[in-house]
A protein has these predicted regions:
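Non-catalytic interaction/Regulatory regions outside core domains
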Residues: 1-88
Length: 88
């Protein structure tokens, strides 16, 4: 899956919200860890049972999930959102 168009940080989170089930919170960070959009509480979160992180050289997206999240699909959605962020 790919967005094939540029996304703003807020746009990336909105796009993810339309695709992914049971995402409780999300944030987009820049390479330095500054929150560009979303929940600032996720800035220091690491990968765990209910937290997924996807990174590129320029951005990171962190999501906190609930028990119904389809994590394999969410991982693909996160990669596509990162692609859209990195196009911008």
């Amino acid at each position: 899956m790919t967005t094939r168009s540029a996304l703003t940080p807020a746009g990336a989170l909105g796009w993810l919200a339309t695709l992914s089930i049971d995402v409780r919170a999300a944030a987009v960070l820049d390479a330095a860890g500054t929150v560009l959009a979303g929940d600032p509480a996720l800035a220091g979160a690491g990968e765990g049972p209910d937290v997924m992180v996807a990174r590129s050289e320029r951005h990171a997206i962190v999501v906190r999930t609930g028990p119904r999240a389809l994590k394999h699909l969410l991982r693909a959605d996160l990669r596509a959102a990162l692609e859209g962020l990195d196009i911008a």
